[in-house]
């Protein structure tokens, strides 16, 4: 990576500003998935071991008005982080002002402070999300000229807490998580060991147009599953019953199929049900066509076998989007089948592009079998599209 990293700067005795991604799910004030906190630990630990004073910034959920602040405080995160680090985490509970500044000024080497949810600043004119220059400048002034961005999950956004701070410090560098994310995803797409197979699922073609276009140029094969299958089917005149379809994307699907030169591999059967919820019948289709009054909710057994064959010998695999409604045991066979086909390839570099695929791998007990699971759905999608991420572009060149 041509950007400075946290290892390139002297941290001892410095107030080091760090953008982490602690946007974790909370239920009644309890964290239900702490993966993002765990993912940030190597960078935080490195800073404090080097004698730096870590000042952490993160958003949590969406905050547009005062009422939205309820249940969006980072207080539970501060407590969880303290337990994981085995030391106190100072939490003033504010995003600016005398109380925050006083707490920062008395920090000692090796201590950690967490600023309150950066999106609290969105209540008054969306200052965080619109990268208000004064806010970025103010937050930058709280440190000693070093900013570490370790929040891959927001690297595709230009906010005050990443791009804004970067613009106002002497050195803006990448943390270990950001560095790893870029290394795995960008290298997989730009300089893959071949054969390189991409697998794209999820419900909407519209979400993945740019990704499909970019990967058709870069990958040896692109396998399509999930709800967007049926938009591709309908574009070819195949009956889809009541399956999900994006009527306004049929021309796009047709154009992608024409452009693909046989690289785009679609399912050859589906698992269909007579309703999305409260169904009374589930069965495998004979071929591609979905029966009248039914809708496809997963890829079928023939498709699993076809995808297994397409993955044989693959050395690089990037997967983004489940093959079906994996949350329901009746429709998770496709996602499980594809995961198992990926991880059994000898010497494969297997990467999950965040979001629902990451949840599927974790929930279905396959997470530890993959080379890398991205922490950022939207950011990884933009990297897969070949886009430049603002949070990354704002870092200091080596």
Curated annotation (Swiss-Prot):
PROSITE patterns: PGLYCERATE_KINASE (PS00111). Pathway: Carbohydrate degradation; glycolysis; pyruvate from D-glyceraldehyde 3-phosphate: step 2/5. Substrate binds at residues 21-23, 36, 59-62, 119, 157. Keywords: ATP-binding, Cytoplasm, Glycolysis, Kinase, Nucleotide-binding, Transferase. Coiled coil: none annotated. GO terms for biological process: gluconeogenesis; glycolytic process. GO terms for cellular component: cytosol. The keyword Transmembrane helix does not apply. PANTHER family: PHOSPHOGLYCERATE KINASE, PHOSPHOGLYCERATE KINASE 1, CHLOROPLASTIC-RELATED. The gene is pgk. Its EC number is 2.7.2.3. This is Phosphoglycerate kinase. It is found in: Cytoplasm. InterPro entries: Phosphoglycerate_kinase, Phosphoglycerate_kinase_CS, Phosphoglycerate_kinase_N, Phosphoglycerate_kinase_sf. It comes from Streptococcus pneumoniae serotype 19F (strain G54). It catalyses: (2R)-3-phosphoglycerate + ATP = (2R)-3-phospho-glyceroyl phosphate + ADP. It is an enzyme of class 2 (transferase). Its main location: cytoplasm. Monomer. The keyword Iron does not apply. Belongs to the phosphoglycerate kinase family. ATP binds at residues 208, 296, 327, 354-357. GO terms for molecular function: ADP binding; ATP binding; phosphoglycerate kinase activity.
């Amino acid at each position: 990576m041509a950007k400075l990293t946290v290892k390139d700067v002297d941290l001892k005795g410095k107030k080091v500003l760090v953008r982490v991604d602690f946007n974790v799910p909370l239920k009644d004030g309890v964290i239900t998935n702490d993966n993002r906190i765990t993912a940030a630990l190597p960078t935080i630990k490195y800073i404090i071991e080097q004698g730096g004073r870590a000042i952490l910034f993160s958003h949590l959920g969406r905050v547009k008005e005062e009422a939205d602040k309820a249940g969006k405080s980072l207080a539970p995160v501060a407590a969880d982080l303290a337990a994981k680090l085995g030391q106190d985490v100072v939490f003033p509970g504010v995003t600016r002002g005398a109380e925050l500044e006083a707490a920062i000024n008395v920090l000692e080497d090796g201590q950690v402070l967490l600023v309150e949810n950066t999106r609290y600043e969105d209540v008054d004119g969306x200052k965080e999300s619109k990268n208000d220059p004064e806010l970025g400048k103010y937050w930058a002034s709280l440190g000693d000229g070093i900013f570490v961005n370790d929040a891959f999950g927001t690297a595709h956004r230009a906010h005050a807490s990443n791009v804004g701070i970067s613009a106002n410090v002497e050195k803006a560098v990448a943390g270990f998580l950001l560095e790893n994310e870029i290394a795995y995803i960008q290298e997989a797409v730009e300089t893959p060991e071949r054969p390189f197979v991409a697998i794209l699922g999820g419900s909407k073609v519209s979400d993945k147009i740019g990704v499909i276009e970019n990967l058709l140029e870069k990958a040896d094969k692109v396998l399509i599953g999930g709800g967007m299958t049926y938009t591709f089917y309908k574009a070819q005149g195949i009956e889809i019953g009541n399956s999900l379809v994006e009527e306004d994307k049929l021309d796009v699907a047709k154009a992608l199929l024409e452009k693909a030169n046989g690289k785009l591999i679609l399912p050859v059967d589906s698992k269909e049900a007579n309703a999305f919820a409260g169904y009374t019948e589930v069965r495998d289709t004979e071929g591609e066509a979905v029966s009248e009054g039914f809708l496809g909710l997963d890829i079928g057994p023939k498709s699993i076998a076809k995808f297994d064959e397409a993955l044989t010998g693959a050395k690089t695999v990037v997967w983004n989007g489940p093959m079906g409604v994996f949350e329901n045991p009746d429709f998770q066979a496709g996602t499980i089948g594809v995961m198992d086909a990926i991880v059994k390839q000898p010497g494969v570099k297997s990467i999950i592009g965040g979001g629902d695929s990451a949840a599927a791998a974790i929930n279905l007990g396959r997470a530890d079998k993959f080379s890398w699971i991205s922490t950022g759905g939207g950011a990884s999608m933009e990297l897969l599209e070949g886009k430049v991420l603002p949070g990354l572009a704002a870092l200091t060149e080596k």
